[in-house]
Amino acid sequence: MKRTYQPSVTRRKRTHGFRVRMKTRGGRAVINARRAKGRKRLAI
């Protein structure tokens, strides 16, 4: 049985990237929460 995490830069950006986050209201809320917390990386 193979491991579940098979890294792919493309898939990572498409599902968790900054532009994807900005598309939905919830995603923008995530970005704002991370900004308020002072995260160095807002999105992957």
UniProtKB/Swiss-Prot annotation:
GO terms for biological process: translation. Pfam families: Ribosomal_L34. Coiled coil: none annotated. One of its GO terms (cellular component) is ribonucleoprotein complex. The keyword Secreted does not apply. Keywords: Ribonucleoprotein, Ribosomal protein. Belongs to the bacterial ribosomal protein bL34 family. This is Large ribosomal subunit protein bL34. It comes from Cupriavidus necator (strain ATCC 17699 / DSM 428 / KCTC 22496 / NCIMB 10442 / H16 / Stanier 337) (Ralstonia eutropha).
